[in-house]
């Protein structure tokens, strides 16, 4: 994990590994974006362990140096950023992606499942209640498949595609303030799936192969996600908790109760020993712990495959 501090007990940036110019470049551009974000500094100061991950003053000084640096960004980061490896047990890194889902502006026999905007009346109401009692005024789009809608909610954002091929950006707007429950764990507990085989694809396959039981499983995750349509002139990428666009295979979701969103990290895989740079742009209800992370894999044709299979032990 990287942090802006001059604590003598932590290591210099290049004491673990020399990263390539491409990774350093993405890190630098991400940190420049953070420097322009008021939310980054607010999150930093609100963190329970402030100023462990760098004080406001430290980061403001670093941001000024980063803005003025036209070349040799790697040298700047090496001199100003330090690495700290926490001593907590290894955690888990998983992946999430931006799904593409069929949508329509009107309801018909095919498109009969509503995508809803946030409304306070749904607070603390279960998934089953909302599915039966939603208000028509809260519908922003219709979709053709409840399972795909369920996983759109799990991922937190997506791209809607109309029958004519036009695309629309579906962004996270809020939730019903009930806790998230993994249906993968439910399927394991009910002996419907082997723990060693559970991933995104085996869960989806089971739901589609067991249509009569599928909804009773999905409704056990009482957390419901609401969306909004976001204007997109250029990029269809989703925005994270800082309001900044997520970077494929670089942005991670972390536990915001431990780390301030926006700080950079090194992910160290336990089995292979390989390391990669990342930056914390997001958070999630299932992401809890010092070494727990969720890597955003993008919205390409391979993004779902990568995210669905990613399940490795790691350190941050």
Model-derived regions, located:
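Solvent-exposed, well-ordered loop and adjacent helix/strand elements within mature globular domains
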Residues: 2-316
